[in-house]
């Protein structure tokens, strides 16, 4: 049986069925003596049915005979059908319309005053109330005539009075400065104060002068520098995965696999997909029309060839 969705080897080659093996001593079996249903003779009864083809026969239907829908029916009047339906519905009425014993209930929702203490208030009624005729009020009193502008082009239109013009001296600043300097010189008494002693600086002229002597200098001892090559304490490590000179020891062998293989889940008998056994393959059959007309045209008989000798069909 092939894999899921695969083909057999014979189907890949393109043959209808595998050729039969002829052995010495086997009897000849005529095709007329072969069973009609070869699969049934080999105990292969569970075979799926093939696809249904559309035809005018009754073989593919449940009923053995085609039944017409409106066979033997008379003309139907739609108005008569409606009247019969209305009459049948009217018979379902038992009597008069049902009236409850307690009467109709009044609503007590928004806009209803049923169940309240005072009832509706006439002030909040939605009816239009009569109103007096509207009389517009009179004009306001004028205490001062209107202004003629913003004040840029008109005189005496602001709240305050108009500023009067006053002329200033050309060199008023120089004259005021002159008066202040004369008053300052008047307050100065005599020449500046001068000391008769020899002047001295605040600090000594020698910036390195010290009262106490400094201690003697200490010379640092110089270490002798050795130019010997550096030698490591242990030999060099060898590359290539060798652990002889490494810091860590060689890891111990472990039987754990590097990658854990995921085992394939083997489905049980009930979970497997049912594949019916393949039926018998068809064999290549020659046409009956060409059995008696096969003739060959070769080098020897091509001169004497005719339609009577070769038949209607010539095979090259």
Curated annotation (Swiss-Prot):
Protein's cellular compartments: Cytoplasm, Cytoskeleton, Microtubule organizing center, Centrosome
Pfam families: CFAP96-like
GO cellular component assignments: 9+0 non-motile cilium; centrosome; cytoplasmic microtubule
InterPro entries xrefs: CFAP96
Low complexity bias locations: 227-237
Principal localisation: cytoplasm
Keyword list, A-Z: Cytoplasm, Cytoskeleton
Chain spans, region Disordered: 220-242
Family, per entry: Belongs to the CFAP96 family.
Protein name (database record): Cilia-and flagella-associated protein 96
Organism: Mus musculus
Gene encoding the protein: Cfap96
């Amino acid at each position: 049986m092939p894999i899921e969705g695969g083909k057999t080897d014979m189907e890949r080659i393109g043959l209808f069925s595998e050729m039969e093996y002829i052995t010495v001593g086997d009897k000849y079996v005529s095709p007329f003596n072969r069973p009609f249903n070869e699969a049934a003779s080999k105990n292969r009864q569970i075979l799926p049915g093939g696809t249904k083809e559309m035809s005018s026969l009754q073989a593919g239907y449940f009923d053995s005979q085609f039944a017409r829908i409106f066979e033997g029916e008379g003309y139907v009047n739609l108005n008569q059908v409606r009247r019969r339906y209305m009459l049948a519905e009217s018979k379902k009425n038992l009597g008069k319309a049902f009236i409850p014993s307690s009467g109709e209930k009044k609503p007590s929702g928004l806009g209803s005053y049923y169940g309240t203490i005072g009832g509706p208030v006439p002030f909040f009624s939605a009816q239009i109330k009569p109103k007096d005729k509207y009389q517009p009020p009179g004009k306001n009193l004028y205490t001062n005539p209107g202004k003629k502008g913003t004040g840029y082009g008109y005189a005496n239109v602001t709240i305050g009075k108009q500023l009067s013009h006053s002329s200033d001296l050309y060199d008023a600043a120089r004259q005021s400065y002159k008066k202040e300097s004369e008053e300052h010189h008047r307050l100065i008494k005599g020449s500046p104060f001068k000391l008769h002693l020899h002047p001295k600086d605040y600090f000594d002229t020698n910036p390195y002068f010290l009262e106490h002597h400094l201690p003697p200098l200490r010379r640092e001892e110089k270490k002798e520098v050795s130019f010997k090559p550096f030698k490591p304490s242990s030999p060099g490590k060898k590359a290539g995965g060798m652990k002889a000179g490494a810091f860590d020891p060689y890891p111990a062998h472990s039987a754990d696999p590097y990658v854990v293989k995921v085992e394939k889940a083997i489905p049980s008998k009930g979970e497997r997909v049912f594949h019916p056994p393949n039926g018998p393959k068809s064999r290549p059959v020659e046409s009956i029309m060409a059995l008696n007309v096969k003739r060959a045209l070769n080098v020897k008989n091509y001169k004497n060839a005719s339609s009577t000798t070769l038949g209607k069909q010539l095979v090259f």
